[in-house]
Every structure is written in C-alpha cells, then in structure tokens.
Amino acid sequence: MKKQELNQAFTHVFGREADATFFSPGRINLIGEHTDYNGGRVFPAAITLGTYGAARKRDDKLLRFYSANFEELGIIEISLDHLIFNKKDSWTNYPKGVIKYLQEAGHSIDTGMDVYVFGNIPNGSGLSSSSSLELLIGIMAEELFDLKLDRLDLVKIGKRTENDFIGVNSGIMDQFAIGMGAEKKAIYLDTKTLEYDLVPLDLGDNVIVIMNTNKRRELADSKYNERRTECEKAVEELNVLLDIKSLGELDEETFDEYAYLIKDAKRIKRARHAVSENQRTLKAKKALAAGDLEKFGRLVNASHVSLEHDYEVTGIELDTLAHTAWEQEGVLGARMTGAGFGGCGIAIVAKDKVAALKENVGRIYTETVGYAPAFYIAEIAGGSRVLSRK
C-alpha cells in the first residue's frame, strides 16, 4: 500500500489528514519452532507482508480505531482512561494493551489518537498479524507522543500485551523479529539471553514460498498453552537430578541420559522436540553461514518431522503441504512455520520450479483437504518503521 493511499484512506474515514504513516512487517520462522518459550534459539525473519497504518494525535482522551480488514465494525471508540480487555472491542484489544503498558512503563500518552489500519497478512495464518499490529501501535505512539523508546523495550511490551492482556502464553520471537528485522537478513536469536545476530539470507537461485493452509488458527483457543505447560512440567521432573531453568539449556546427549526422569511418554516427546529443535537451529545457522543450502534444507525437513511426531502440532493440512513439497523437484526443504494447528508452511525452492510447486502441491492439497491453499513469495523486510510524516 502506498503512503498516498494510506493518507487518502485515513482522511476518508476520519475527515482529516494523518500526522504520519507507518508499516510493521509480519514474520516467518526459518527454523526453531516452539523453542522461544523453552529458552532456546529461533531463526525468524521479517517479511514484506504486514500491517500498514496511519495515525493522528487528538486533543481529547478518545482513541478511535478503524481497520479496513474489519470494515463491518466501523470506528471503535475507547477512552484512554478505560484500557481494559473487552471481547466486544475485537482487534482493538491489542492496541489497548500496548498503550496501557507503555503508560505503565512511564511513557506519557496523555491524549487520544485516530488510528487507521490495513493488514495484508491473512488473519489466522500464523505469520504474526497480532504481533505486527502490536509493534505498529507502539511506533505510532512513539512518533506521535515523541517517546524516547528503546526498540527492545517496545518488543517486550508487545510480548506482555500478548501474554497478560490477551492471555496467550507465547514467547518473544514474533515481536523481536518484527521490531528488529532487517532487509535480506534473518535474526538468529537466543531467547534466554536476547543476544542476536543478523545473518545474511543468501539463498542463491532459491526463494522462500509461503504455503497457506487457509485453515484459520485461534492461538488462545488452541493447544499452544497446553504444550508450554507440558514442557514446564518436564523441566520440573528433570530437575530432580538436574538444575535447569529451561529445556534450551540441554543438548541431545544430556537429555537422552536423563529423559527417564520424565514420567509421561507424551511429555518425553514434547521435551525431546524442544531440545532437538534447539540443536537443529544452531546447526542451521552454521549451514547458512557456510553456504551449505542442502544441509540447511535437510534441517528444515527434520524440524517438520519433529513437530509432526514429537510435538504433534501439525495436522493433515500442514503435513500435506510439507510432505507434498518434499516430493517436488527443486525443493531444498519445507516445513510448517509458526505455532501450527493450521496456518502456514514454508518451502525453500528453486526460482524456476516455483510454478510447478504451486500447481502440484495445490492440486494434491485440494484433493486431500477439500479446499485450496494459497501461495506467496516471502521477501525479507526491515522492521517496524515510519513511512512518512506530515
């Protein structure tokens, strides 16, 4: 969406020009799935699909929100003095949480805003539309109220909004990737220390294709929180003899030696995924840095296998996409990305084989599942940013 279109859309809804326009990306995760809340490593990248916004500062205490994605809801009005979760307020609960926690952190947001939002991340696709929105609202407030805001602090406020305001027990990966993203680079992040490297994403003659199951997933209502609880229980059981804060501290050899302490076969599988995926992510970074794309692809495939069999978060939709992609010519690797239970997969595929991938995977998926998937090329983008000022 062009800056001029954003301004025109804002003026059409609110009757006045915006003070500034903004963009906040979505994200994919190359590898390192369900490791961020297990104290492990992740390897995400911001993408050019994302959330556009325009905003104007008000003189009163009114927050007015409008989303072009939810036109039927019209303008949703909320008082700055009444920032509490209310299911009736739909998507605006995310902005409310961000503003509330910015205020609690000592930042002065003393008047309201008019906010226009348009996202081209498919809702429920697992490409982090909610985190994209959280960071968008954060940079709007930063710009309009001249806040002296450290980007990492804003990332943490986004995570807190997700956890404490919305009620989803997610890790920090999504907000970090969206807030700290850089063009043509992936972020290798240690979620325990928040130390990170920006790694050039040089895929040669290959591209990343996002494969959308078109099965919407509702994170808070899914088994996401259940998986986290299973892993936390496994840590408790391992700590009968070990002294660890998270599964991310273990290598596979140590885990295999002490896995007998976990008293439930299902929890052993969950913990084994967290440990092995963490090690795969470390190997994947090294493979990418060395230009060994074939090894990188094999690790991506192994990640899906572990998510399918040990963590059990895939389902027929994601499995059909990944398994079918593995059989296609020119595919280095494919797996689910995001929390699972629907959402999207990714495939790393030769540029000249993309059309065949779409045709073949699309056909087999439609025959198997009963409706068609969608495909997009993932361009790697910079993080949340101001597009224009008045």
From Swiss-Prot:
What is this protein identified as? Galactokinase
PROSITE patterns assigned to the protein according to its UniProt record, in alphabetical order: GALACTOKINASE, GHMP_KINASES_ATP
Q: Where does Mg(2+) bind?
A: 130, 162
- State where substrate binds: 33-36, 224
| Species of provenance | Streptococcus mutans serotype c (strain ATCC 700610 / UA159)
The record's GO molecular-function terms, alphabetically, read: ATP binding; galactokinase activity; magnesium ion binding
Keywords (alphabetical) are: ATP-binding, Carbohydrate metabolism, Cytoplasm, Galactose metabolism, Kinase, Magnesium, Metal-binding, Nucleotide-binding, Transferase
The organism's superkingdom is given as: Bacteria
Please list the reactions this protein catalyses.
alpha-D-galactose + ATP = alpha-D-galactose 1-phosphate + ADP + H(+)
Q: In which pathway does it act?
A: Carbohydrate metabolism; galactose metabolism
Similarity comment: Belongs to the GHMP kinase family. GalK subfamily.
Binding site residues for ATP: 67, 124-130
Q: Which EC number applies?
A: 2.7.1.6
Give the function comment from the record: Catalyzes the transfer of the gamma-phosphate of ATP to D-galactose to form alpha-D-galactose-1-phosphate (Gal-1-P).
Keyword Metal-binding assigned to the entry: answer is yes
